Amino acid sequence: MSSNGGSNTNERSVGPDSGSLRSNSNLSSVNGDGSDSGSTRFRHRKISVKQRLRIHLPSDLKNLDKNEIQKRELLDVETGVEKNEEKEVHLHRILQKASVLEHLNSKKDYIPTPDASKTWSDYDKFYSGKFVETQAYVKFSVTVEDCCGVPYTLDEIDDDFLENSLNKNSDLKLNEDEFESLCSAFETAIKERQPFLQMDPETILTFDEVKPTLLKVDFNNMHLRSQLAQEVAAIHNPQTANSSSDGNGPFTTVFDSSTTANVRPIPELIEKYGKEVYEHWSRRKIEAKGAEIFPQLKFERPGEKEEVDPYVCFRRRELRHPRKTRRVDILNSQKLRILLKELRHAKDMSLLVAQREQINLQLIEDDLKILNKRKHVISIKRKLDIKGEDEDLINHKRKRPTIMTIEKKRQQEEALAAAKRAAEQEKAAAAAKAAEAKNKSKAQKKQNEQAAKVKSSKQKNSSSQDLTKKVTQEESQSEEQQPAMSHVYVKLPSSKIPDIVLEDVEKLLQNKEKSARRFVQERMARRKLEDNDEFINLTDDPHNPVFDLTTLNCSEVPFSPFSSIASSKLKINKSFYLRDLNDYLNGIATDLKVFNKDGEKIEDNKTASGNQNVRKTEVYNPFDSGSELHSREYPVKFRRRFGRGNIEYLDVKRKIDNFSDTRFCEFIDFKAIENQELENNGRNLDVYESRADEFSRLLEKWKFDSTNNEYGLRFSDEPARLNQISNDTQVIRFGTMLGTKSYEQLKEATIRYRKDYISRIRQQKLNAQKQQQILQQQQFLQQQQENGSPNNATMPINPINKSTLKQDVASNVLVGTQQKS
């Protein structure tokens, strides 16, 4: 076939025949009148940087095959397979032959496939699988790396180090599994502390710096067994976590590998072999340039473009399209949060179930022990012929505890609510009946009152009725406008005068001092949590560092602490630093460092040669009176004692003036009291009634007790010290301030009361005058009706005199105040 006018006359069809027609048309279109019909039919793809293009030289044009030039167009055949699989060698060859050389080659090609008709005779020898029925319905899905043990693998270099260096002269040897566990722990710790170690491998941390991170428990990977054992309380001592002395074996989980079953705990391995193994591992880490010593499989990470990297395994075949909306992300994140919450809830429930079963097991074991003890007691009682008192040896039936479930609790709440509703309905019905009875009685009363009013209204005149209505309206309005009666001694709101009990000044100062101490303790505890066992606070130890202190005899006023930030009243002459205090006390310490008051290290020739006068601190022994070490007495004395948990404390006893017994005996005669108590030889003397014992204890208390500390007043006496006045003056000033405030508020209340009283008297006068005028008008109208005078006559009304009204009000106010006084 040939193309006419460069137009494409063939149609797109499926099959090798149509492919041959299309290829022939393409060839004829190229060889025809010069029109490129293939270019109009085929869409050229964009040239990619990753695609390899073949370069043809001018000398190679005459030797090129036309089929090779049109290779891209010849492959445009509907194969029915995916685009990525069209490049397969056998399929590619078949497509070329089917499209171009089908009429020349009668032999058909096919894609080779393995012959699956035959069976392998040695299959049972290598694949002997047996189905084992599972014991639980809970399944888990984890990777092989999570269940096959530690990821580190021992090689020849590690084996040589383990045999020739580490285990050469040691009795308790480190096996290969424990060595791999240590190296894996090192790898995990370095990943956490130094994630960018490949930038500079020489800066790898030392063993002492990595040790706190190694001792932390990794609950998500290797120490899940220890966590479960601690939470269930099955293993109290982590050193016996893998011991099977109980007969029950170690506490294992599904995630534990069989290779790590007999491995000792990581803290024990770190203490015994950690330093030597870490030095060997760090050398290999530096040789690997900070990367992993054993290369791991490189997987495809989401969000990273690693399409060119040939070492990425298990690459996904589909294209990752960019996500343009955030709605799906929000929904997925919410689902993940809900899933995480449910998983945590399931974990807590499983741990609680494990704890419950552990407690039940412990109860059963205790019952068995009690039974054995009872049997032993019964045998002993039979041997000794002891009868009776056998109730303790009988196992009484225990009452089954009532378990309050959620359903029972809900039923009880519903019953209570129904009872409340029934009671309320009964009360409402009774109230409705009472209201109906009251309404009936009120209606009858109203009818009687209305009849009486009709009779009285007929007797009275219409004009008098209008006047009385106006007066009653004005009176009601005046009563509504009148405020509530006030009194001088009425209790005002708490916002103006606080209704509180004034506390003692000493109590307030003590509370302030307690709050300051509590604040300091909370800050120290918070700082300890922030350090996270990575830093050690040496200031908590009274022995290390040791200071040679001298106290100031007096404190000047400008340098005295007037706030919570107190300046130091101690002057440090020399300070000492040593690693081990016991070696120093035994006299064998050699690494003692001495610093002067400026913080500079003293390295004189005398000290370098071992001058003990500079390096040695004096130790005072109060029981060794024969050999005194001091020419003068220390301002403070120390006492060493052991407290709870075998914690050593160093107490400080301040030097105070001893209270003389003679001064105390000036007030109390001890001999007379002792003679008086010795006279009562007939009866035993109670300790609480002994006056001699009471006064002797009081004397001992006065010897060592003092209301002040060793440096003067308490820090809580700050208000008086800030104002440069005494504490008594500060108390008087505070009381005067409260008195003036209360006096001002009392004065305001008195003025307000007088104003209300004057306005009330004025209103009463006005109402009385209005009533008098109304009565005069009524009398005048009655006289007119009796005499038969015309209705248009007017009655003279006396106007209200304001001046007289003011005088009357003033006189009433004076009389009222005199009565109050």
Swiss-Prot record:
Any one biological process term the GO annotation gives: regulation of transcription by RNA polymerase II
Chief location category: nucleus
GO cellular component: NuA4 histone acetyltransferase complex; nucleosome; nucleus; piccolo histone acetyltransferase complex
Stretches the record annotates as Disordered: 1-43, 427-485, 779-799
Example of a GO MF term: histone acetyltransferase activity
Cellular location(s): Nucleus
Superkingdom: Eukaryota
Low complexity bias: start-end ranges: 18-39, 449-465
Keywords, sorted A to Z: Cell cycle, DNA damage, DNA repair, Nucleus, Transcription, Transcription regulation
UniProt feature, compositional bias: Polar residues: 1-12, 786-799
Coiled-coil region: none
Pfam families reported for this sequence: EPL1
Similarity comment: family membership: Belongs to the enhancer of polycomb family.
Subunit annotation: Component of the NuA4 histone acetyltransferase complex.
Functional summary from the UniProt entry: Component of the NuA4 histone acetyltransferase complex which is involved in transcriptional activation of selected genes principally by acetylation of nucleosomal histone H4 and H2A. The NuA4 complex is also involved in DNA repair. Involved in gene silencing by neighboring heterochromatin, blockage of the silencing spreading along the chromosome, and required for cell cycle progression through G2/M.
Protein's UniProt name: Enhancer of polycomb-like protein 1
Lineage: Eukaryota, Fungi, Dikarya, Ascomycota, Saccharomycotina
Gene it is expressed from: EPL1
